[in-house]
């Protein structure tokens, strides 16, 4: 029995970060009812219905196929909303309102409902109507700048940093927090999760390190960049790679020793001074 046992969730089928949020809620014990399309989404990069390897986002969910442009099917969703604790949607801004499933309509049916919505840029603002993908959110927030080696173009990251780290996880945290509020007050809330905002939030560690003078604008010129030999990847004799991140002085000394170098070699003096500064901070 998970911590969300007894919580009922209605999820309007979408792409990537939104289904992942529903999956996490289901993993923690919530009953998730997925409202699927009666016909495949022509704009989806992956057909989750025919691609079994991609259907893991449906794990632990029940499902029903409805046409959200059909008033009778919209009413079916609203009936489910009346009996549920959470609704999740990842449509473009204004779409659920046009369908008759916006927050105001849903809260009229169920004032305690937690209405979770996911977009790339937020519901309002100059970029709200724009399309976007993970790399766009990671780029515009500045997070992509710190990946890669000096003089190289920024490295595209896996579709995790923005979509999942900046989108899915903030949405789930917002939903679970709002559930607690609804239980205590009887009032639901709207969780407006924007992947761009969540990605900026997740950069808090980087900005903190930069404020301490340990993160420079130049890629690979800091303690944590891929350009430093104590934080990098190396190809081994078998062709595979090993990752190394020996930031703290004790780990760095162990790395030097295991590599067969002399710890007291004069060539390490500057590095030892830099590590001593890091330790003092």
Where are these regions (language model features)?
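N-terminal helix-loop segment corresponding to the beta1-alpha1 unit
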Residues: 1-187
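Acidic, glycine-rich segments within the central catalytic cores of soluble metabolic enzymes
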Residues: 140-281
